[in-house]
Structures are given as C-alpha cells and as structure tokens.
Amino acid sequence: IEVLFSDKRPFFTENQSIFDDALVKNESVFYTRRIGGPRDDNGAAGDIEAAVKVIGSAGPVNYGLFAAREDDADEVGRSYYAGRFVIPRGKWLLGTQTTYTERPFRNRTALVNAFNYDIKPGEVWRLVGQFMRSDIDTDSGDSSGLGSFNAIQYLPNDRWQFEFSLLHYDDTLDVNDMGYLRRNDLAEWYLSAVHDWTDFPEDSRTASVSMRAFATRPSNTDGVRLMDNISVMLGQNMRSGSDISLRINASLAGYDDLISRGHGLVYLKNRFNGGLTYSTPKRGAWRKSVGVEVIQEGYEGWGMGLQAGLTWYPYEKLNLDFSLQPRQSRDWLIWIVDEERLGSYSRRNITGRVTANWFPAERHEVRLNAQWLTIDAEGRQGY
C-alpha cells in the first residue's frame, strides 16, 4: 500500500477545502502530492511549470477550478486538471468532482468522476456517500472501474455517535493518477461507536473519558474473506493534565491478498495487539510519557515494544520533543521479492526522534525534525 504524505506547500493547502471530498479517511480523487511528484521517466521530483486555482460561487453553487502543468509536459511532464461543484443547503449537500490527468511518457490519460451527497433527514440522523468512476486510456487498452461508499450516522446526543458504512471498489477502479486510494478490489462493511464521559464531579481527578470502538469485515471482489478487525480505544484525561490511553486490537483469521505482491493468497491466524500509554502533566519545563505494547505481526510469534518520551519547554514559544521506541518481535513476516516466498524474521529495532518547534511570531512557525531507525533481523523460517 502506497504511503500517504500530507502536503506542506502553501499553494496546495490554502483555500483548498472546496476540493476536499474525502469521506473515507485520507482517500480522495484529488491528492495534491501527485503534482511535482516522481517523474514518469526517472523517478526524480517533477518541476512545476505553472499552476492556477480559481475558487468562487455563482448563485447556489460553490466551485473550484484547478490546473497544473509540469515542465516538458509534451514528453515526460504531466498535466493535471480538476473541477469541483458543490450545492450546499441547510439539510443537504450535493457535490461533483472531475479530474483529468495526461501522462505522455506513459501514453496514458485518466478521467475520474465523483459524486457525493450529505443529507440530514432529522436532528439525529445523517446520510453521507460517494460514487466514483474511473476511465483509463493507455496504448495497451482502456479500462473503467466503479466505486461507492455509503454511510448512515446516528448521533442521539453530544456523548454518543454511531456509524455504519458499506464500501465497494471494483478491481479496475483506479483514481491514483491524480487521487489517492489505499487499494481497490475491496468490499467492506464498517461499524463504529464513540462515547464521551464529561460529567465528572468537580472534586474528581478525572476530567473526561472517551471510548472508541470499531469493527470491519472486508473481502475482495472475488468473495475471498480478508481479516476482520476489531479495535477498542480508551482515553482518560486527568484534571492535573496527565492522560492515560489504552488500545486493544484483534485481527481475526483470514486471508491477506496483498502481502505476496500478486503471488497468491496467504492465510493468517488470529492476531492480537495492545498498548498502554501514560503522559505526565507538565511540571516546570518538562513533560514525560511512557508506554508499552504487545504485538503479533507474523504467523504465530509475539513481540513487545516500549516507548519513552520527553518534552522540554525552555520558554513559551519553543519546545523540544525527544522519543525512543525499542521493539522486539519473534515473527516479522515479509515477502522476499527475489526468492518469491515469505520469510519470518526475529527482529530487533529502535526508532528515535528529535523535534524542535519554534513560534517566533504570530502565524510563524519553524520546525526541525530528525528521525532514525535501526533494524537487526535474523531469518527463522521460510514459507
């Protein structure tokens, strides 16, 4: 699965909300990091020759128009176009978005159309959804794909929130020329419940408690059942400024159709993961956190990890974060491309991070970040 990165370039972040149609977390037909991303010919960063964005309204319609062109767009650069139209009303919203991408080096064009809705039939109910179609034109042939997401939300009060959704992506749906989709070939239902407790007496050490519970049942479009997932997260905020969080996750036995990189299905047993984290209140110029986790990431082995964090506030507008996360696992399961088989490794790794955040003036921020990772792994078993 491709890694998703957020965009930091002001032109692609300011006044960009009109193009936001992401109903499934982080997924959208317009992903600005594509523009100026790795070139099709050599993988180096593409240079942007020009870009323009127009945002406005005409009567009841809000609109956004976008176009960008990379250098050498006639040969290796790419051209991007997007149009978004939204009709908002008090109890409902309808929107459409169309993107078009030209990639001459690959002799490829991609047209994506999306339609989304947001309807509030009552005070406690909400219906949201999106339908997508992709049309890809290449020298080797044309393809089209469909996708849909529909959800119903129930919010009886400000403490409870429930959601049930259905998702279906064809195995030919492809929006990633200009958008971001974690994967296609997926049919999934999702159920979540959120509850917040805030009515603690004033003399209680607890300020609030939150609970998040999620369950998913995925399969691919061939009907192969993938691993079901159940997660529960609890968080407790104390009046002193400290907080405690607990996470429990279970991935139930099923198939993984991605880990082998297209070489077949892999059946995995139940996997369980959990973690507990505690953060102290700020005392003087320091705040600390500690955590422990138990993991299963392979076929049958267990592992564990620790986390230690320290934040230093030398003065109000500057803070420095230090964190260290050692982890050891007896069963790190990965696909070995050259050997076309799975390998189980005994792994030890340490992740470290140092971050400095400085706010010299209003609307000004300077951030420096250093991160490193060390891994020592020994092969145990091949499959």
Regions found by a protein language model. Give the residues of each.
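Outer-membrane beta-barrel channel domains
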Residues: 1-217, 248-256, 281, 292-295
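Exposed, low-structure sequence patches enriched in small/polar residues
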Residues: 47, 132-383
